[in-house]
C-alpha cells in the first residue's frame, strides 16, 4: 500500500504514493509533549506520504502503523489511550478524515474507532453511562456501518476499560 523506499514511489494506475519519511514514534513525536505516552508506543512507526495524480493537488498523508496489537487479540487499554493521544497530537487542529484499518478492518480497527467515538461522546454521557454501557452503545452504532466491529469479548473488555479510564480522567 505504500513504498518502502523514499527513492522508489509506488505507482498504481494514475496514482503515485511517495514516502517522505518513516520514523519510530519516539523520534517523530516530541518528548516534551505531555499528552503522548511515547514509552507505550515502541511498536508504532509514523510515515509521512504524499499521494499525487496528474492534474490534481497532492495529498499529504500521515500514517500511524502500530504492530503491537495481535489479530483478534485484546490490548491493554493504556496502549489504546496512547495511540489516541498520538493521533490527536499529529492531527493538531486539522479536520481531515481519520482512516483506521487493520487486516480485516473490524476487530482492532473497530475497537479503536469505538474508543475514539466514545471520547467524543464522553462530555454528554459522562455521568449517565458506565464504561461498559458506552462500549456497548458505540459498538452497536459502529456496527451499523462496519459490521463485526469489536470482534472478540477481549476487545470489548479492552474498549470498556479504556472508556472507563477516559471517564475517570475527564
Label the predicted regions.
Residues 1-170:
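Cysteine-based protein phosphatase catalytic domain of the PTP/DSP
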Amino acid at each position: 500500500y505504500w513504498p518502502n523506499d523514499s527513492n522508489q514511489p509506488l505507482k498504481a494506475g494514475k496514482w503515485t504514493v511517495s514516502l517522505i519519511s518513516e520514523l519510530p514514534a519516539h523520534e517523530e513525536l516530541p518528548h516534551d509533549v505531555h499528552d503522548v505516552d511515547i514509552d507505550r508506543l515502541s511498536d508504532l512507526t509514523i510515515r509521512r506520504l504524499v499521494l499525487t495524480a496528474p492534474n490534481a493537488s497532492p495529498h499529504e498523508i500521515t500514517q500511524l502503523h502500530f504492530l503491537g496489537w495481535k489479530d483478534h487479540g485484546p490490548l491493554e487499554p493504556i496502549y489504546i489511550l496512547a495511540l489516541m493521544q498520538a493521533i490527536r497530537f499529529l492531527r493538531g487542529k486539522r479536520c481531515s478524515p481519520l482512516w483506521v484499518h487493520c487486516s480485516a478492518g473490524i476487530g482492532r480497527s473497530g475497537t479503536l474507532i469505538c474508543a475514539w467515538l466514545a471520547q467524543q461522546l464522553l462530555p454528554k454521557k459522562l455521568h449517565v453511562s458506565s464504561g461498559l454501557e458506552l462500549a456497548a452503545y458505540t459498538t452497536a452504532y459502529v456496527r451499523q456501518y462496519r459490521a463485526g466491529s469489536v470482534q472478540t469479548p477481549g476487545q470489548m473488555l479492552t474498549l470498556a476499560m479504556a472508556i472507563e479510564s477516559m471517564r475517570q480522567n475527564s
